[in-house]
Amino acid sequence: MNWILTMSLTACLHHTWFIKPIPFQSLIINKACHARISPRIVAALIATESGFNRNAVRYEKRVNDYSVGLMQIRMGTAKMLGYTGSLRKLKLPWVNIYYGTRYLKNCLVRYPNNWDGIVAYNQGRPLWDDERNRYILPNGRPQHYANIVQGKLLKITSPSY
């Protein structure tokens, strides 16, 4: 079983979320547990994607779309998940985290390696590399993004954060 999904059950049942408060903590816990994803992973992803900046906006040239809000969700991705609102509304933290966690859950279920799912959240569908026996980013680089998220995860769950 996917350890991120298993970790979510433990975190949501035992309320072992964060050692210190983080921005949007209750919202992250609520939406992550609803999607059955570890709140810690969602928080690490938000720290990586937007640095907890609810107004973050980035133009994605390769797909001609904007990534917005805490989880840097693209309008096209949100629409794929059933979103019908405006770009402005998608930046609202509760809306952004709701659609971001839904998309992350899809990625984690689709890819057998947790970190491949994390990479898929950021890069879109990764490519399978038979030589490495794992997924790689579309541009051929190793999964540096997953390492960044993992580093943020360690930071937000350590007492010195």
Task: Please give the residue ranges for each predicted region.
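Sec-dependent signal peptide recognition
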Residues: 1-8
